C-alpha cells in the first residue's frame, strides 16, 4: 500500500506517519509538507511544497496511492479570524481532495475532524469542520474521523496549555469515547483503507474498535 500524508509535522500526523512507516503492509509513505521532516526512513518520500491551495509541480505525490491521510489542522484558538481557520480546515482539505480525485480516483480520502463537530453547531470550529466533512464526502466519499483527545507525538504547534495538560489527559484512557492513541488512529485509518470504508463519520469509540481489528 502507498499512502500520502498531510500534517506530518503535527501531533496527530506525526503519530500517523510513524505508524504507517512501521506497518508491514505499507511499502511507501509520501508526505507533503512546508518544511523538511526531522525523520528519515527508507519508505518515506517528502515533497516540500508551500501552497496548499495549488499543487502544481507535486501532482506525482498523489499518483498511484491507495489512501490520503489528511491530518493537517489548527486549533481555533491559534487563529484570530474565521476566514483563516476556514482556509486551513476546509479549503486546504478540499483542494487536496480534488487533486487526489484526478490523480488516484480509487484512493480513500481520510479527514481528521474532531469530536463535537456539528454543521449547525454553536461554535465556529464545529460548523467549519461540519461543512468540510459534508463537502469532502460529496466530492470524494471521504471517511471523516472524529477523535476526542489524541495522545500523539509532541508538537511545537500545540497550544502551551495542551502540552502542560497532556499527562493528565492520559487519565482518560479507560474511556473509549474520550481518548485514543495516535498510533491507534493510524492503525484505524490503514484498516479502514483495507476494508474500503468510505463516506462515513467515525467517532472516537469506533476508532478504537477499528484499530483493534488491524493486523487480525
Regions found by a protein language model. Name each.
Residues 2-25:
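N-terminal Rossmann NAD(P)H-binding glycine-rich loop of SDR-like oxidoreductase domains
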Residues 3-4, 38, 45-95, 99-102:
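NAD(P)H-binding glycine-rich loop region in Rossmannoid oxidoreductase-like domains
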Residues 22, 27, 42, 118-215:
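Oxidoreductase cofactor-interface core, primarily capturing Rossmann-like NAD(P)-dependent enzymes
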Residues 23, 35, 74, 79-127, ...:
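Conserved Rossmann-fold NAD(P)-dependent oxidoreductase catalytic core, especially the SDR/UDP-sugar
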Residues 31-38:
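Short, polar loop motifs at secondary-structure junctions
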Amino acid at each position: 500500500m502507498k499512502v500520502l500524508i498531510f500534517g506530518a509535522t503535527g501531533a496527530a500526523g506525526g503519530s500517523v506517519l510513524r505508524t504507517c512507516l512501521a506497518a508491514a503492509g505499507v511499502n511507501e509513505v509520501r508526505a507533503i509538507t512546508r518544511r523538511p521532516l526531522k525523520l528519515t526512513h527508507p519508505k518515506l518520500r517528502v515533497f516540500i511544497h508551500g501552497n496548499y491551495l495549488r499543487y502544481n509541480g507535486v501532482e506525482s505525490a498523489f499518483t498511484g496511492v491507495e489512501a490520503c491521510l489528511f491530518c493537517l489542522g489548527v486549533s481555533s484558538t491559534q487563529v484570530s479570524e474565521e476566514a483563516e481557520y476556514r482556509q486551513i480546515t476546509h479549503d486546504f482539505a478540499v483542494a487536496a481532495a480534488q487533486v487526489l480525485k484526478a490523480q488516484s480516483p480509487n484512493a480513500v480520502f481520510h479527514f481528521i475532524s474532531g469530536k463535537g463537530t456539528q454543521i449547525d453547531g454553536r461554535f465556529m470550529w464545529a460548523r467549519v469542520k461540519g461543512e468540510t466533512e459534508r463537502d469532502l464526502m460529496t466530492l470524494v466519499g471521504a471517511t471523516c474521523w472524529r477523535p476526542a483527545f489524541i495522545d500523539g507525538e509532541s508538537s511545537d504547534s500545540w497550544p502551551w496549555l495542551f502540552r502542560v495538560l497532556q499527562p493528565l489527559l492520559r487519565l482518560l484512557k479507560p474511556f473509549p469515547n474520550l481518548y485514543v492513541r495516535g498510533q491507534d488512529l493510524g492503525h484505524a485509518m490503514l484498516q479502514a483503507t483495507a476494508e474500503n470504508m468510505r463516506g462515513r463519520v467515525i467517532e472516537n469509540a469506533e476508532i478504537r474498535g477499528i484499530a483493534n481489528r488491524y493486523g487480525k
